[in-house]
Amino acid sequence: MLKKNDIVEVEIVDLTHEGAGVAKVDGLVFFVENALPSEKILMRVLKVNKKIGFGKVEKYLVQSPHRNQDLDLAYLRSGIADLGHLSYPEQLKFKTKQVKDSLYKIAGIADVEVAETLGMEHPVKYRNKAQVPVRRVNGVLETGFFRKNSHNLMPLEDFFIQDPVIDQVVVALRDLLRRFDLKPYDEKEQSGLIRNLVVRRGHYSGQIMVVLVTTRPKVFRVDQLIEQVIKQFPEIVSVMQNINDQNTNAIFGKEWRTLYGQDYITDQMLGNDFQIAGPAFYQVNTEMAEKLYQTAIDFAELKKDDVIIDAYSGIGTIGLSVAKHVKEVYGVELIPEAVENSQKNASLNKITNAHYVCDTAENAMKKWLKEGIQPTVILVDPPRKGLTESFIKASAQTGADRIAYISCNVATMARDIKLYQELGYELKKVQPVDLFPQTHHVETVALLSKLDVDKHISVEIELDEMDLTSAESKATYAQIKEYVWNKFELKVSTLYIAQIKKKCGIELREHYNKSKKDKQIIPQCTPEKEEAIMDALRHFKMI
């Protein structure tokens, strides 16, 4: 039995979702940082539980041809670039696989094509926003990034994936904080003044916002600090203060103050101008966000008479991008400043058919339903926790033709798609987009279409209404699906089962009238699944 500090030779067979190597030894699964599939290593055991363990690389015996040898390991240790040791083409393949695996394991979906992940031409130095902790390290005020799975600061000046100008602003602010002897936050003692520095920079405009996150309102000589940093970076148009006096991991507190200039920066997205406030959500990779949103727009196949609901609308980036091409846009966002920004952004771009409210997405959806607003397309871009069940049910009740789902967490997206399918929607397209190169995170766009008589034949059998002989089994669709999965590990749809039943001469009761249109889009059962269904029908003595 392996124990702590044992050294053993292992081969890495897989990667976890977070990018750790996976090795199997003596019936245990070990997770190893900075190890890639096909690599053989000497592994030191760090920790062992009943079924899993953790190890670290003592020595590489065989290295992967896909290893990026040039990566500074500080970016791995901090988690800034937890996939940076893997070549970029392989990162994209890894992310495509993550999306496919989640859809299959969580939603049971294997028959919808997942397109290859859209990558970035230059996959470094892309982030338009930095959130940098300020701490004392060896007696000196430092800025940097926390070591992975800890709150121990690693001093850094080059963050690898951030806009280089943002890195320069952070270093300049660090030096000024030292010069003016402003005390960094001490998490253990709950003391000190400066907790975090947040810097935004417009990808197209170049405008810069600086946010000082402090534990109390008064900042000694703050006017002089601002004067000095603006001398170095005249592109700074906004200096904000956020006051966070709570014992929390949250970056921002509730109180905001404008110390210099305006309380927003302006940048462009898909041809529109957007004002971006300090607390507002705005995608951190502008170049790839435009591809992400354009994909969602293309998937939705918008028409002039479409009515759009833009849930989790942020500052209106996607809703305002489509407003000029549709009849109406209704957006909902929980952050008041973001709603105010979206309303200003609509005016800024002379858009009059976009309407925004401050509320939870599920509450707004229910209110709009009561008001008789009938959307044809719903756009959702929720946080990592995904959609609530009440929102999904309310959105399905609208009868919207199409739902374009933008997700930053494929696991919760797969969970939500599963419920949408139960409520009469079908997954049609999936496109991963790499908004976060060098990390394990991936954004995904999925298109759901409502099943209707114009495009699909949906059949349902009511066995109790059929005249079955004593030899026939009353196997339900669910039982047939379960049998096929247990024996063949294949997922088969109700439609496929119905097709094979019809082929075998089993009479079906149609749930809907068949469409009279010539061009019906009806998926056809594959030969492999047909044989599995036939086996099930024989098992249940239905043929």
UniProtKB/Swiss-Prot annotation:
Residues the record marks as active site: C408
A GO term for molecular function: rRNA (uridine-C5-)-methyltransferase activity
Protein name per Swiss-Prot or TrEMBL: Uncharacterized RNA methyltransferase SP_1029
Taxonomic source organism: Streptococcus pneumoniae serotype 4 (strain ATCC BAA-334 / TIGR4)
Family: Belongs to the class I-like SAM-binding methyltransferase superfamily. RNA M5U methyltransferase family.
Record's keyword terms, sorted: Methyltransferase, S-adenosyl-L-methionine, Transferase
Positions of the TRAM domain: 1-59
GO biological process: rRNA base methylation
Cysteine pairs bridged by disulfides in the record: none
InterPro entries in alphabetical order: MeTrfase_TrmA_AS, MeTrfase_TrmA_CS, NA-bd_OB-fold, SAM-dependent_MTases_sf, TRAM_dom, U5_MeTrfase_fam
UniProt entry tagged with the keyword S-adenosyl-L-methionine: yes
The EC number(s) this enzyme carries: 2.1.1.-
